[in-house]
Amino acid sequence: MRVCVATIVHHPEDARIMHRQIRALLDAGHEVTYVAPFSHFNVTPAAGLTAVDVPYDAAYGRARTALKRGVKGADLVIAHEHRLLRVLPYRRPPVVWDVREEVSDGRRARALRRHHVITPATMPEATQVAAAPPPPGDTRVVHLGRLTADNGVRELIGLAERLVPYGIRMDLIGAAGPGVRPLLRDAQRVGLLDWFGHVPHRHALRMTQGALAGLSLTRPPGGTPTKILDYMGRGLPVVTTSPGAPLVEPAGCGLTVPLDVNGILDAVLDLREDPLRRLALGRRGHAHALAHHHWPDHAAAFVARMEDWAGVPVVTHSLAV
């Protein structure tokens, strides 16, 4: 099977796209053409796939041109933005829309009339769960993933400043939007935090281990942040704003706070003062992630579903995940 996977806004090394979906397809012996903004993010395409470069947030014309190249000879298209559904070539294979953003029921229903649709309800979000992560420490907090104003960058910087007197440092692991990069550089220059930029996914996950807490400060009413699963899979207590509550509260693995520096600070300091609570929250999150969100448990089903939608006979795969 030949699959065209396309995004115009996500980092080419996006964990869901590259390290779970594409890797599972490649490990199952399928061919992948990846349409993504490689040049914008200064990323060299991974070995084993065919790359088609596209400008970041490309206009319709340029996105259509890139997608037309990508779908040539493909048996299936996996699109990661709704905008890409508007620039599909007339002659094309079956299309899968992997819903990554908040969308209305009407838009989803319209897409279902023409295409296949993946949502968290049909295919659970997942992560690579560590076998035996170290217990949470008490000297640093971490934020994993893209840094933008909507992801609470200003609050993260404000929190980092308030944590300095307590000897707690902040590690930010992920690329940043152009509008917040100067703020992050200034904060790093004066020693408030450590910003590592984009880090390869497996290494980034290891970097989170042993932190006091994983932070998710998405501005309401944003979608449920999948970084929370990464924290859970590494045994970290989670401090999240309300968009993360649907993951954190059922698992009993963290604290829900308002998008307010004082409230976030209180939550972090409460966790620091209670190592037994930190350990219990981390263990509950890890157990929940292992039971429900461990990618190796879902990879074969994902590949089989793509084969079915492409009209390729389903075979049994042993996936190296």
Residue ranges and their predicted role:
Residues C4-A6, M123, P133-E161, D171:
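Conserved donor-binding/catalytic core segment of Leloir-type glycosyltransferases
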Residues C4-R62, G70, A175-G179:
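N-terminal strand-loop element at the rim of the active site
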Residues H40-F41, W295-V321:
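C-terminal alpha-helical cap of glycosyltransferases
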Residues V52, V96, E102-D105, R110-P136, ...:
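Donor nucleotide-sugar binding/catalytic pocket of nucleotide-sugar-dependent glycosyltransferases
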Residues R181-L205:
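Nucleotide-activated donor-binding/catalytic signature segment of Leloir-type glycosyltransferases, i.e.
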Residues R206-G223, L236:
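Acidic donor-binding loop of glycosyltransferase active sites
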Residues A251-N262, D270-L276:
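Conserved acidic donor-binding segment of nucleotide-sugar-dependent glycosyltransferases
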Residues E273-E307:
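A charged, aromatic-enriched C-terminal amphipathic alpha-helix characteristic of glycosyltransferases
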